């Protein structure tokens, strides 16, 4: 096993760590630095807090000090000496910036009173004030550990659920996976021929309700005056058949059930029937009415067509004789219909049966007579066209449409004029009058549209191909002219990123370090010169 690398917490901050720190502060706030530091591999909680308070806080002021701020800084340093965090909060600046500015303003003995400056660092030493320096620039590609740290921080910061909700979701998923595994095992056992039932879950407390067996807030109906034992048997039968179906095939598997035929279903239902024995009290049985027994159905098996007229007549015959002493006075139309019906029924009644053909012929004869009385024929101008072929007449007409067609065909063959009813003639005349009065819209085009259509000539296929060829040539020429410039620009940018930028950054850092060394040496030389001048003056005075 490879040795685990030991990281030293600290070092200069990178841009990636700054961005992760900002996002973590937005989520966890400025009081949970241990959670913030858990997202950064090379920083601890104190360093994260110092980095935020000294560099990344948007409320900090990094502008140059003014004269009023210098006076305020000196005043605060006298009032609360060595409490630079409090002074920085009062000034609205980082504590290290206030220390650096105070060291610049003071011109006293370095060994006694001067505080540690941020720039007094030699090459190779650990800078204790990395939190107040700008972040290091990102590299072209992130390292593996940085990429892993970024992925973990993104996953944790995007998670908006708490620990309890996450645990509940994990437990729910675990229960669902257990249930699916149990159902799969039960299905495999059923295929192997081993029947296993689903056990009820263990109750957490004694009064817990099992909603698969019991019904919440169920209220049993009070016994009534009617006997409902047959309905109870039917309900019990349906319940048992449903439980058996669920036990054998499942709750949602109904495709195979739809393919069953009716006799198979009936046979299966007869096998499941079971009598329900019930102890009824004597008191309730005395007040119950007997069961309603209906006559059994006369038609069983295949269905056949029933004539409405014969069924109505049979129903009238089955009615009992009236018990009233008065006679029912019918209207004239009802009396005529009754007389005709009585005549037809007497003539058609043979050996206690009503033939279907006699009833149909009587109804057709009545409808034909009624239609002939209502219709009044008048000559009309509409005739069958001579070029059309006359169809053959219908041998056995069944309705008015067939009879009307036979009448028109016979009139055409005999050369007689064809008559229509007054209603049809009036309707046709209205259609002709409405068609003659309608105005037909003009199809003349607008003059401007007509001139534009005449002047514009569509381009031919040869012209379109020529235009497409020219566009392609211009595009290739433009790409060739830009290609050399694009390569030069990419080469320059690559040289700048690989060579010039690192060199300039190193030179700038070296210049900054040398300049700070020179400034410290110059300050030391000035102090030594002043001390020598004072000693010379004292020597001259003593002489």
Swiss-Prot record:
Gene Ontology biological-process entries: mRNA splicing, via spliceosome
Compartment(s): Cytoplasm; Nucleus
InterPro entries the record matches: CDC5L/Cef1, Homeodomain-like_sf, Myb_dom, SANT/Myb, SANT_CDC5L_II
Subunit structure: Associated with the spliceosome.
Protein name: Pre-mRNA-splicing factor CEF1
Limits of the Myb-like domain: 59-106
Purpose: Involved in pre-mRNA splicing and cell cycle control.
SMART domains the record matches: SANT
Region described as Disordered: spans on this chain: 256-275
UniProt keyword terms in alphabetical order: Coiled coil, Cytoplasm, DNA-binding, mRNA processing, mRNA splicing, Nucleus, Repeat, Spliceosome
Any GO molecular function: DNA binding
Organism whose genome encodes this protein: Kluyveromyces lactis (strain ATCC 8585 / CBS 2359 / DSM 70799 / NBRC 1267 / NRRL Y-1140 / WM37) (Yeast)
Gene: CEF1
Location of the DNA-binding region in this protein: 33-56
UniProt xrefs under Pfam families: Myb_DNA-bind_6 (PF13921)
Ranges where the HTH myb-type domain occurs: 1-58
